[in-house]
A protein has these predicted regions:
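Generic, well-ordered alpha-helical scaffold segments in large soluble proteins
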Residues: 41, 62-69, 91, 95, ...
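Short runs of predominantly hydrophobic/aromatic residues within well-ordered alpha helices
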Residues: 38, 85, 89, 235-238, ...
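Alpha-helical coiled-coil oligomerization motifs
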Residues: 140, 144-147, 188-191, 257, ...
Length: 475
């Protein structure tokens, strides 16, 4: 098949080279962005009298027809044509003739590819934002549903202090809030228009980039044409966002795996979100959680891979940069899956609050509160720490816990203990006493939930703002 760039060559491209360099297998998903960019470019060319209105109309109509064919799965892509840009241009030229050959006037595949990816990433940011909000809503709903459940909080994966289950859920809410904030920067940098930069140095045709910017809904234009075609920072930033949100979901998945085990028995995942064993009939496996955990490393790989690819590239475009797309496309798909399925799992799981409380009642998670009790009576905290440590050791040897001791036992340990000690170190009191701003007391967690709802409302306003920007694309 003749190449659209083949004039300089005397030989056809080796089939192995075609297969190796082709990107149509993955960049075909940018067809809508490519067509929108081409329509805007053709419209601008006609406005500037670079092509005729008749050619513009033929190009726009032809591109609309092609989009309809791709939408319906009726378009046959060719590896020999390398990428989505050349596949569409070749079909357009076949369909409308000479006018199709004028579409690429004043444009390079370098700025064409860049503008496609910018528009694609903008859409992805909106989708990711909506998925984060839904996940945050699931966390708040679950925190409210189990608002009175107290569970062990852990350090070093050992029981440490009692916390409200809702407090634990809201910790993940805060992580996702930061993830949403990262999308603000990704969108800001994706919302810069590179079209008009040409191959690297701009255009000699008297194009109107400001007009094209308006047609494609970009907030601004790249100041420097060389930067425009070589910049992939916004892709790196999206992959960084993806890596962090997947890390947060992986930590949650790890906890869901542990909590759903017989050893913990804190939660039960819904049957719809688990799988079984081909040999062990009793098994109910948290495969989804395990896959989220596993796919996190894959997302990290995309980030590191692109950083490594870009680090040695001279300005401006190099074919290495084709490697930006598979990674970000896969990251988008992976994060989409992970956020949506985690939201469903959180909403569907059952929390075994009674067992969590029983675990706390049979443990030493209230030891810190016992030391705090002494410190508030004037005992230096380090001395109080030593006294309580000895008491815990005594209980371990006797096969009991602190709550099993009598008031007389406590007074034998230290004269500073009074009759109120058992109330002071009850699990409920341990939680209620931590009523500082970020603490786990019920009123604090309620405030966190209420603040979270306002955060979600603000995030939804931001998503609407993004949608408004994208809606300006004149397709």
């Amino acid at each position: 098949m003749a190449k659209l760039w083949g004039g300089r060559f005397t030989k056809g491209t080796d089939k192995a080279v075609e297969d190796f360099t082709s990107s149509i297998a993955f960049d075909a998903r940018m067809y809508a962005e490519d067509i929108a960019g081409s329509k805007a470019h053709a419209t601008m060319l006609a406005k500037q009298n670079i092509i005729s209105d008749a050619d513009r109309d033929a190009i726009v109509a032809g591109l609309t027809k092609i989009k309809g064919q791709i939408d319906k799965g009726e378009f046959s892509f060719s590896v020999a044509l390398e990428d989505i840009h050349m596949n569409i241009e070749k079909r357009l030229t076949d369909d409308i003739g000479e006018a199709g050959g004028r579409l690429h006037t004043g444009r390079s595949r370098n700025d064409q590819c860049a503008v496609d990816l910018h528009m694609y990433v903008r859409k992805a940011v909106v989708e990711m934002g909506e998925l984060i909000v839904d996940m945050q809503k699931a966390l708040i709903e679950t925190a409210e549903k189990y608002s009175d459940v107290i569970m062990p909080g852990y350090t070093h994966l050992q029981r440490a202090q009692p916390v409200l289950f809702g407090h634990h859920m809201m910790a993940y809410f805060s992580m996702l809030e930061r993830d949403f904030d990262r999308l603000l920067m990704v969108f800001k940098h994706a919302d810069i228009m590179p079209l008009g930069a040409g191959a690297l140095a701009g255009s000699t045709y008297g194009i109107d980039q400001t007009y094209t910017q308006k047609l494609l809904g970009f907030s601004r234009i790249y100041e420097n044409s060389m930067d425009a075609v070589s910049d992939r920072d916004y892709v790196v930033e999206f992959l960084s966002f993806s890596s962090l949100v997947m890390m947060h979901l992986s930590r949650l998945s790890e906890e869901l795996i542990l909590w759903s085990s017989n050893e913990f028995n804190f939660i039960e995942l819904d049957d719809a979100h688990c799988t079984g064993s081909s040999i062990m009939p009793q098994k109910k496996n948290p495969d989804v959680c395990e896959l989220v955990r596993g796919k996190t490393g894959r997302t990290y790989g995309h980030l590191l891979g692109l950083l490594t690819t870009l680090k040695g590239l001279p300005l401006t475009y190099n074919k290495d940069m084709q490697e930006d797309k598979e990674g970000i496309f896969d990251a988008i798909d992976t994060v989409r899956f992970a956020l949506s399925i985690n939201a469903a799992m959180i909403r569907g799981m059952k929390v075994n609050g009674a067992h969590m409380k029983a675990v706390l009642d049979d443990d030493f998670s209230n030891a810190t509160d016992m030391a705090d009790y002494l410190a508030k009576k004037g005992v230096p905290f380090r001395e109080a720490h030593e006294i309580v440590g000895n008491a815990v050791h005594h209980c371990i040897e006797k096969g009991c816990v602190l709550l099993d001791l009598s008031v007389e036992d406590f007074k034998a340990i230290s004269p500073y203990f009074d009759a109120d000690i058992l109330d002071a170190i009850s699990i409920e009191a341990c939680v209620a006493g931590r009523n500082n701003y970020s603490g786990t007391a019920p009123e604090c967690v309620e405030r966190q939930r209420n603040n979270g709802k306002q955060i979600i409302a603000n995030e939804e306003i931001q998503i609407d703002n993004w949608k408004e920007i994208i809606s300006k694309v004149q397709e």
